[in-house]
Amino acid sequence: MSTLLAPLHPYAGRVVVVGVSGGADSVALLRALVQAEARPVVAHLDHALRPNSAEDAQWVHDLAEQLGAAHTSTRVDVAAVAARRGWNVEDAARRVRYEVLSRAARQHGAHTVMTAHTRRDQAETVLMGLLRGEAVLTGIPAVRGRVRRPWLDVPRSEIEAYLKALGQEWREDPTNADVTYTRAWLRTEVMPVLAARFPGVEAALGRVAKLAQQDDEALRDLAAALTPHAPRDRVPLAVLRRRVTQELKSAGLQFHVGQVDQLAEAQRTGETRHVTLLGGRGVTVTGGALHLAARAWPLPSFSWPEDWTLRTRQPGDRITLPGGTRKVSDVLTDLKIPRDQRDDVPLLVSAQGVKWIGVEPNIWAKGARAVVGQPADLLDTAMGEALGLAREAALAQEVPVGAVVLGPGGRIIGSGRNTSRADSDMTRHAELAALRAATAELGTAYLTGCTLVVTLEPCPMCLGAALEARVERIVYGASNPKAGALGGVSDLLSSHWGHVPAVTGGVRAQDAARVLRDSFQELRQRRLKSPDV
């Protein structure tokens, strides 16, 4: 019992969100937290994968009531989320589960979230990584952000003995025996065979994870310390693999382990090698340096009038957008297109100016779509919705900013406006409201493939939220010279982040600026009439 309680004593008197499914591990962790005099908040996720899953939710609710613990329960159709996002069910369940735990922590002011992963879970994770050919078998980390996993070294036998000593029952989830799920197959069919020949297999795999985590941390530090032009021929491959991984991730590229191996080996030997990554982006190693291939810019897939010319940019090129006329060079700069690639971007140009810019997605001059029979601009329409929300905010005497989130298919899945004044809360920005609504709609914290459309360039707080949510693209109207995080004050995306969204600025910029200007003029007039406003 001391093995179970010892890591929990530091949390005495503290609010701790604990994920409780009803299974033995999580029920034991809840009981142990109560015994250690912590203040547990029970968070349960009903995955809606079984017809009687609501019975588990009620059972967990009753247990929390008996123990006097706060309780929250959420039902999410995990299978539907998986189908919608292109994930497998196990991955979707994990992502949704941690979002539910994080939400509960925010609601209850908890700085710690605990899960009841045990030595068995760790062993299965390491074995799964080995079978998948993962380069580093680090397994499940004991600490990640606010999440703590105090029982990664605890065998299942100790947990069951603890529950039996308490006379505490638990629930058995039938899906844990469904071998169509990889982890269930490993648990029910593979691990028993290994344990029969190697009785200490769980502890051995757990040791592998712990040592691998220590090694990986040291090697990642060495990789990060490599300067761009330092010779690579004497750098260990283990360090080079991590350096390549860091560079590809910072560029927002997708890849698999074999591609990292090829690039790292080429860096060390000095040979020239080209690798096409997932998604078609090319990477070349020459002279030990990593070079990303230039993008393949899209050409027009439609017919255009005879007086339009297909060419690349020239000095002075301008395009008339719904929000006003802008230099093409400024548009390409806002899109974060590297300087050495801007002269390769195709344009359609008439005597009146640039009509079309060949980036993804295409940028059209005002009225140009109708000339060639193309459908309405999705971003223009979305910005119109955001402007409507900004005007609502202005009427409510809030800072007039509105935002919407477009799902992968282009449908609006979240919207919001500023409510900071009404709520006396400076985190009530339009972007955060729209992101919250979108995550609730999709049932996950990650908005992969989604676009955030906002009338005013985001501040650092809202940009940070978009980065955490893995938003694929940020579109804004007016620049923000007082708090803009995308160039208005500082371009925070110029630093190296794990995920960098594409950025499009200036969409209906004049309309967005007009809403701001009119609102602030009205506010100044009210203050002149009544200084207390």
From Swiss-Prot:
Q: Name one GO cellular component term.
A: cytoplasm
At which positions is ATP bound? S21, G22, G23, A24, D25, S26
Q: What InterPro entries does the database record attribute to this sequence?
A: CMP_dCMP_dom (IPR002125), Cytidine_deaminase-like (IPR016193), Lysidine-tRNA-synth_C (IPR012796), Rossmann-like_a/b/a_fold (IPR014729), TilS/TtcA_N (IPR011063), tRNA_aden_deaminase (IPR028883), tRNA_Ile_lys_synt (IPR012094), tRNA_Ile_lys_synt_N (IPR012795)
Q: Which keywords describe this protein according to UniProt?
A: ATP-binding, Cytoplasm, Ligase, Nucleotide-binding, tRNA processing
The entry lists its GO molecular-function terms as: ATP binding; tRNA(Ile)-lysidine synthase activity; tRNA-specific adenosine-34 deaminase activity; zinc ion binding
What species is given as this protein's source?
Deinococcus deserti (strain DSM 17065 / CIP 109153 / LMG 22923 / VCD115)
Domains as described in the record = The N-terminal region contains the highly conserved SGGXDS motif, predicted to be a P-loop motif involved in ATP binding.
- Family (UniProt): Belongs to the tRNA(Ile)-lysidine synthase family.
Protein name from the UniProt record: tRNA(Ile)-lysidine synthase
